[in-house]
């Protein structure tokens, strides 16, 4: 019996073929035309310079005969009704997309390429979730029948864009990659949507975004005649998307290389490019350079927009510098144009404060390099960052000139105020958050009035402070003010109830959200309430909500699976956690990460099933994942639970090798297997291992672990180890009836025990005195 009930579907698979989208933004700015772009083959014909590039048009015409279409598809035995195709095409040309879909569903034959491509295009172009699902179902059918070649590049590109804008990043990327593998280049707007969606996603999304951008631009460069691929060449928007990925990673070198590459494609940086640069400065901790990005925009004559102001305030709030953020908002309220001057003054004040702090700490500046955390490598890295910003912002090298003025006055809007309010919320300033809301209500400018994001921020502030009644009052006030609460607002409230272990009230809110507000819960809503069930040890409830989510057609995310695994692991049901893990592995929409592996290891280790846990770790390594501190911590606890100190020695050996990775220099090593990353153990891991070794009388290994703790700045719990030694080993090596052979064998162990007693401060042979509990003999 499968504990994870699949959602109701005609498919026999445990998972729906594609996730149901939550929402779609307004129609994308992509011209819907009947004649699609040409598909350019990018397969190996480029090796022969004299050979013409193969091109074929996937566009059909309304007058195409059945024989022509059959010949084009390469399947002369296939028959379909030309009359039905004409009716379908008539509906599509008149923008009767829903009627065309009904006609397609009722038809028993597969329409021709023109009808299919146009139907997918128009469904993708609509801003309705069900339309995207319909378009995806057509693609699924064609894939199953091996007829994907019936769709043209325009329809696939629109489908990828719609999927990206609805949050289905992996689906959008898979469509783009499928086009590339088939030898076709997607339209720049289509692949830019995928790159942008990846750059903003979590995990390794930004890295994959950069890889996708490079892969496409390399293929475009292969064409000698660039006019053939003019619609696939990257534009400024494409570069902004990949630069955003670099900013999210804090990778200044890649940012600079791609920024320089813009000129090769005749692309000029725009205001969004520099807004992304503000984010880059924030990610790498270069707060003092933000003002020079703004000055660079003004000096280059680029039109400053309100999004730049948003980026500035968000950057300073992210640094926790609410003082500067408040000054920006105040300058905007006073209709000042000398914002650059204000920011330079803030930089000068920060520099002065930093110099004063350094003067106070001057006596600590000459401590040992290791103690202070200083390394030459860190200095080189910092210097590299400085050099990149000197190229990106040459105006920052000599900022002695007069700061430029803004081209016009910008008044703060609700987003500016809300961003500042989020800073108050993160700092626990609940009263300031509430006062800001009241001040926004009194603004004359309607653009400054609070919106649903503002109210949600206030709700978050009260929830974080544990004031759930006040948070519900804000929700009621939103209804009175005519500001509809959104899904995020309800999710914040759900999280608050779950944190306070009020799962019943969370369930009531979930029903209220659906029935009264008409807002369907999403995967985040269910993840929150599943996690709440874990907090009250209700694994059955967690499973029930997981199955309810799938029944509603909501695709589980990585967090959904790992949260359910946590429920079973915490309740002592590792086999059920393993079954959830297997479902996760088989779900193509989810990428298994180290957290999921660790949760599986934790489930077995909690019961002392160390052999099962070790098998999971072996599988993990085979799949390219290296154990981290959490993995080793679970294993150490499992060894302690199973009372197998011998396994602790093997575990310590592996950890010791991982800790020494950075110290080993092997620049010319030609090994095919990459070395595992360096491990920095924490107090919990080392303390558990030391505890096991002391109890098992492995004093030499215990001293090694203690030395490792001291190297990593972790104070050993000497009192605890002394108590263990006195209780368990105080009479060790005191037998007078041991044979000489036995005495000889334990010489090394006795020496280690004496060294350990010396470290504990107990009487030992190093003092030349006997350890006796009785009165001292003079």
From Swiss-Prot:
GO terms for cellular component: chloroplast stroma. GO terms for biological process: mRNA processing. GO terms for molecular function: mRNA binding; nucleotide binding. PPR repeats lie at residues 235-269, 270-304, 305-339, 413-443, 451-485, 486-521, 522-556, 557-587, 593-627, 628-658. Pfam families: PPR, PPR_1, PPR_2, PPR_3. Residues 355-372 have a biased composition (Acidic residues). Residues 1-65 form a transit peptide. Residues 351-381 are annotated as: Disordered. InterPro entries: Pentatricopeptide_rpt, TPR-like_helical_dom_sf. Gene3D superfamilies: Tetratricopeptide repeat domain. Keywords: Chloroplast, Nucleotide-binding, Plastid, Repeat, RNA-binding, Transit peptide. It comes from the Eukaryota. It is found in: Plastid, Chloroplast stroma. Belongs to the PPR family. P subfamily. Involved in the processing of polycistronic chloroplast psbB-psbT-psbH-petB-petD transcript. Could bind RNA. This is Pentatricopeptide repeat-containing protein At3g09650, chloroplastic.
